[in-house]
């Protein structure tokens, strides 16, 4: 049965599997992309694998940073990932609670200071990300409860609000 476009049978089966063996909750996510050198192409592209196949995603810097602005920039993709993750978590929590949503939209916004990226300052690139959720289908108090649970459970929110170790590796060919 689907609620809010969430397959509750699949989600419940996975939750039961994880309850029996917590290692089943661990999923590796990886993308590999390439910088595109020929003019006229977006600067970066990657093929993302998913359960139904693959999707090519392209990014391009805005003109003021030397790109052509042909595609969304990397920060927009970060915000998209956060908004999509939060929406998926919100819809799933609502479904768990038996709430059938009639509307759900999520906006993710930040202000970017590019001085450090340009090498002419050390100001933080961003100091705030704002998520705005517009939802209907239940009482305000129930939607607030769902929003709080989504904030607690969303992997994208966790990535922004907790220190995560970053490793970089350079391979010279």
Describe the predicted segments one by one.
Residues 79, 85-87:
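Compact, glycine-rich, soluble single-domain proteins
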């Amino acid at each position: 049965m689907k609620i809010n476009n969430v397959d509750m049978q699949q989600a419940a089966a996975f939750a039961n599997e994880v309850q029996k063996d917590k290692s089943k909750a661990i999923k590796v996510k990886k993308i590999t992309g390439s910088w595109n050198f020929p003019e006229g192409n977006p600067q970066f592209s990657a093929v993302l694998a998913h359960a139904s196949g693959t999707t090519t995603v392209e990014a391009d810097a805005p003109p003021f940073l030397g790109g052509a602005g042909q595609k969304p920039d990397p920060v927009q993709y970060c915000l998209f990932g956060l908004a999509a993750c939060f929406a998926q978590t919100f819809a799933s929590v609502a479904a768990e609670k038996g709430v059938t949503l009639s509307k759900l939209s999520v906006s993710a916004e930040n202000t970017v200071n590019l001085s450090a990226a340009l090498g002419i300052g050390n100001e933080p690139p961003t100091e705030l990300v704002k998520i705005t959720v517009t939802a209907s289908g239940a009482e305000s108090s129930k939607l607030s409860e769902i929003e709080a649970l989504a904030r607690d459970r969303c992997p994208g929110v966790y990535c922004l609000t907790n220190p995560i170790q970053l490793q970089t590796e350079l391979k010279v060919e």
